[in-house]
Regions:
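N-terminal leader/targeting and accessory segments in enzymes
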Residues: 1-81, 85, 338-339, 367-381, ...
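Peripheral docking tails and interdomain loops at the edges
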Residues: 393, 412-429
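Phosphate-binding loop of NTP-binding sites
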Residues: 78-212, 216-224, 283, 402, ...
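Active-site beta-alpha connecting loops in nucleotide-dependent enzymes
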Residues: 34-37, 302-305, 322-391, 419
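Acidic, Mg2+-coordinating active-site environments of NTP-dependent enzymes
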Residues: 3, 60-65, 172-316, 341-342, ...
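ATP-dependent carboxylate/acyl-activation modules
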Residues: 97, 304-306, 421, 425-426
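Residue-level signal for inorganic ion chemistry
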Residues: 27, 46, 82, 97, ...
C-alpha cells in the first residue's frame, strides 16, 4: 500500500495505538515488536477491542478476507514514515530539543511558556526515542501551531535519524555531558551525536537557541543562525541567580537595557537556571508576553522524580532519582553543598551505562563527597561499593529500605539521586 493511501486511513482513524490493551474505538493499531513481545500476535485482539485497522508485518497473523489487516514490510519503519509524512502535510513549526541533562525539564518549561499564547503539542514524559518521536508526531492536529519534540540518544547517529523524522524548524541542545559513554564511546562521541541536531539545523539555516555560557556548545556552533541566552549583558535573554535555598530564584532581562524581571520557581538546583533561560528565550521569540512567561515559570511544578522537593513527616527530600550520569551527579552535589540547609544527607545510586569509564567516574564522585561536609552518606550499587571510601554502602535498594524500616533518619535534608535502574525513588515512602 502506498504511503499516501495509508495516510488517508490514518486520517480517518484519527488516533494511533501500539498497545492492544488501549484501543480507542476507530483507532489504528500498529504492531510493533520488542525484546519480549510481538505486536503482530495482538492484532486480532486490537481489532476486537475497537480498532478500525491493524498494520502488521507478518502475514500469518492476518485473518483471511478481513480487509482491516494492512500488511507492510516493517511496522516500525512504516510508523516512522507515516509520522514524517503527517508532519510534512500539516507544516506545523517544530522545535527540536536534545541534550545530555535537563532536556525533559527544559521541554516542560518551554511548553509551559509557549502554551500561554499558542496551541502546543509536546512530547509526553520522555518519549524521545525512535518510537516516542513518531508517536508524538502522529498526535499532531491542524489546530497545533507549534510542536516541541524531545529527542534522546545513547548511540551515534540517533539524533540525525530522529531529525530526519521530525524535521525541526528550530532547535536547542541543553548541554552535553558524560552520559551513555558505553554507547557513545567517549565524551567526544556525546558531543558529536548531540551536535547532529546542529548539523540538521545548519543545512536549513534554521534558528538555533544556544546557551552562550556553554563552551562545548559554542565550539560546535559555527555557521548556525543563533539566538543566545546566558549571563552576559548583551544577549537576547540574560540573567543571574538570586537564590537557591531550596528553590531556584533568578532575575532576567531582554538585551542590555530590558526591564528586569524577578522569578521565583519551584525548581531545585542552580543547574536549572539555563533551562529556565532557554524557556524565556523561546517564549520571547514566539511572542509570549513577559508577564505570562514569568507566571508559567513560577507555577511550573516538577514531576517524575526530577528536581522535586518533598517534605515528609520526618525529613525534607530532594528527589532527583530519574537518572544520573557524572555530569548531572556532580552538578546536583555542588548545588546541594551550596544550599544553606542544616543536616545534609546523601542517598546516591550507581550511574549506569558508563562502560570502561565507570570505576573512575564513580571514584571522582566519591572523592568530591569526601571533600564536602555532608552529615550522612549512603551509597547504593556495586560501582560505588567498589570505590575507595568509608561511607555506608548497600548492594541494592531493598537493603536500604530494610534499614529505613528499622531506623529511619529524622530531621535531615536528603538528596536522592541515581540511575533509574537503581530504583531509589522507592525509598521515598520510607523517609
Amino acid at each position: 500500500m502506498k504511503l499516501s493511501a495509508l495516510y488517508q486511513i490514518f486520517l480517518d482513524c484519527q488516533s494511533v495505538t501500539t498497545d492492544s490493551r488501549n484501543c480507542p474505538d476507530g483507532s489504528l493499531f500498529i504492531a510493533l515488536k520488542g525484546e519480549s513481545f510481538n505486536g503482530n500476535a495482538f492484532a486480532k485482539l486490537a481489532l476486537d477491542s475497537g480498532c478500525a485497522f491493524a498494520i502488521i508485518d507478518e502475514i500469518q497473523y492476518a485473518v483471511e478476507d478481513d480487509q482491516r489487516y494492512i500488511l507492510v514490510d516493517d511496522c516500525l519503519q512504516t510508523m516512522q514514515q507515516l509520522a514524517n509524512y503527517h508532519r510534512r502535510q500539516l507544516g506545523t513549526r517544530v522545535i527540536g530539543i536534545t541534550g545530555t541533562n535537563g532536556k525533559t525539564t527544559t521541554k516542560e518549561l518551554i511548553s509551559s511558556v509557549l502554551c500561554q499564547a499558542h496551541n502546543v503539542l509536546y512530547t509526553l514524559g520522555n518519549l524521545n526515542n525512535h518510537i516516542g518521536v513518531p508517536t508524538t508526531l502522529l498526535r499532531l492536529k491542524p489546530e497545533h501551531d507549534l510542536a516541541v519534540i524531545e529527542m534522546g540518544a545513547n548511540h551515534p547517529g540517533e539524533i540525525k535519524f530522529l531529525c530526519e523524522i521530525a524535521e525541526p524548524d528550530y532547535g536547542i541542545i541543553t548541554n552535553v555531558g558524560k552520559a551513555h559513554l558505553e554507547g557513545f564511546g567517549s565524551f567526544e562521541g556525546v558531543i558529536k551525536t548531540k551536535g547532529e541536531l546542529y548539523d540538521f539545523l545548519r543545512k536549513k539555516d534554521a534558528i538555533t537557541f544556544i546557551h552562550h555560557d556553554n563552551p562545548y556548545l559554542m565550539n560546535i556552533s559555527q555557521g548556525l543562525n543563533l539566538i543566545s541566552y546566558g549571563t552576559e549583558d548583551d544577549l537576547y535573554v540574560n540573567g543571574r541567580i538570586t537564590g537557591n535555598s531550596p528553590y531556584l530564584a533568578f532575575e532576567w532581562k531582554a538585551g542590555k537595557d530590558g526591564e528586569l524581571h524577578q522569578v521565583c520557581t519551584q525548581l531545585i538546583g542552580e543547574y536549572n537556571f539555563p533551562n529556565a533561560l532557554a524557556a524565556i528565550t523561546i517564549g520571547r521569540f514566539f511572542g509570549v508576553e513577559t508577564k505570562k512567561i514569568d507566571k508559567a515559570l513560577a507555577e511550573y511544578t516538577p514531576q517524575n522524580n526530577r528536581s522535586q522537593l518533598k517534605k515528609t513527616e520526618n525529613n525534607t527530600l530532594i528527589i532527583d532519582a530519574y537518572n544520573a550520569n557524572p555530569t548531572s551527579m556532580m552538578a546536583a552535589l555542588q548545588n546541594f553543598r551550596n544550599m544553606t540547609v542544616p543536616h545534609k544527607m546523601l542517598i546516591l545510586g550507581d550511574m549506569r551505562e558508563l562502560g570502561a569509564d565507570s570505576p573512575a567516574e564513580h571514584q571522582k564522585i566519591v572523592d568530591y563527597i569526601k571533600e564536602s561536609n555532608f552529615e550522612k552518606v549512603w551509597l547504593v550499587g556495586e560501582q560505588f561499593a567498589a570505590s575507595e571510601h568509608s561511607f555506608k554502602t548497600y548492594a541494592n535498594v531493598q537493603e536500604v529500605i530494610k534499614d529505613l524500616q528499622e531506623d529511619k533518619p529524622k530531621g535531615y535534608t536528603i538528596l536522592i539521586k541515581g540511575s533509574n535502574g537503581i530504583k531509589l525513588s522507592s525509598t521515598v515512602e520510607f523517609l
